[in-house]
């Protein structure tokens, strides 16, 4: 699914010109929505051949792909956009059509609401326990649950997160830390320093820079002192060695949308894409004998 995810999101960046609305919806596109891609989890429902998937083999590496805030409607529109602009639909939906993926639905209610938020959702997905909205791996009575990336780090694997929002934001943090509040992002940055994860990249300069933090702590200097390569531009990230851990922070808050980045030559030079961050993270960790576990998040889908 790794290639699927990148293809879906990069699809929006391949074209710098926005088609007009009439052209987008003409020639039966609305019929296509109603007949073929209304719900990709229901259409093409065939029984998966688990023998073909070699279910008894153990995975060495695990990549969690998070499209935060994406509904099936978002996926449908991506497929429609690609069909109109490139003449072929999304690779993701093609996997459904060919029955090459195992798919499922889950109840995402948090411990205190039928409507979850990113922190509770990430905590339950990664840690297996429902927690109240707003908290990160902390239960209603203060119970602390070990985050999934800490478990894998203890097991000897390399671990990391890359995202288009602040690296201290709820979804990556839900795989990494314990915190009563998802809003404690300065504290979360400090926890990352103690965890010694191998790759952490996204936005969030305001939670690392001394002149932005309330406590005036220079988190960049602290990470560098622990042996991290600190990257603040695309060039610095691309030139970083694969032999040392990497902290990459490429925006004050979130990094720009693809459509904005790809229409701005300066942003293209200075800000890496999610695909580029993910590839750099994989290159950093892929040769580790015990493998790696990584979360890749497209975090601004519903912003």
Sequence positions of predicted segments:
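Phosphate/oxyanion-binding active-site loops and adjacent basic polyanion-contact surfaces
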Residues: 181, 270-278
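N-terminal catalytic scaffold of extracellular/periplasmic and nuclease hydrolases
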Residues: 32, 43-244
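N-terminal export signals
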Residues: 23-45
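Short, Lys/Arg-enriched N-terminal segments with co-localized hydrophobic residues
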Residues: 1-18
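Active-site His/acidic residue clusters
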Residues: 170-176, 253-266, 289-303
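Active-site regions of oxyanion-processing enzymes, predominantly non-cytosolic
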Residues: 231-233, 237-250, 277-299
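Twin-arginine (Tat) signal peptide motif
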Residues: 16-25, 50
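Generic beta-strand/beta-sheet core signal
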Residues: 65, 162, 202, 250-252, ...
């Amino acid at each position: 699914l790794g290639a699927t995810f990148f293809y879906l999101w990069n699809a929006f960046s391949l074209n710098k010109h926005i088609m007009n609305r009439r052209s987008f919806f003409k020639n039966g596109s609305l019929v296509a929505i109603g007949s073929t891609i209304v719900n990709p989890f229901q259409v093409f429902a065939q029984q998966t051949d688990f023998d073909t998937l070699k279910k008894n083999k153990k995975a060495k590496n695990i990549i969690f792909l998070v499209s935060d805030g994406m509904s099936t409607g978002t996926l449908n529109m991506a497929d429609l956009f690609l069909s109109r602009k490139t003449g072929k639909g999304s690779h993701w939906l093609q996997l459904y059509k060919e029955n090459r993926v195992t798919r499922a639905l889950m109840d995402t209610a948090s411990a205190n609401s039928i409507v979850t938020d990113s922190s509770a959702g990430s905590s339950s997905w990664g840690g297996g326990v429902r927690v109240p909205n707003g908290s990160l791996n902390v239960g209603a009575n203060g119970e602390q649950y070990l985050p999934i990336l800490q478990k894998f780090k203890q097991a000897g694997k390399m671990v990391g997160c890359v995202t288009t929002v602040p690296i201290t934001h709820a979804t990556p943090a839900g795989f990494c830390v314990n915190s009563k509040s998802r809003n404690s992002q300065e504290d979360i940055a400090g926890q990352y320093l103690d965890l010694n994860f191998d790759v952490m990249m996204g936005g969030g300069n305001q939670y690392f820079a001394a002149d932005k933090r309330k406590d005036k702590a220079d988190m960049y200097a602290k990470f560098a002192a622990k042996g991290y390569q600190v990257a603040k531009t695309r060039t610095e990230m691309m030139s970083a060695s694969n032999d040392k851990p990497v902290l990459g922070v490429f925006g004050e808050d979130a990094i720009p949308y693809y459509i904005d980045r790809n229409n701005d030559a300066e942003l293209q030079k200075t800000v890496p894409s999610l695909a580029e961050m993910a590839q750099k993270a994989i290159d950093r960790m892929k040769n580790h004998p015990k493998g790696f576990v990584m979360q890749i998040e497209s975090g601004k889908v519903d912003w």
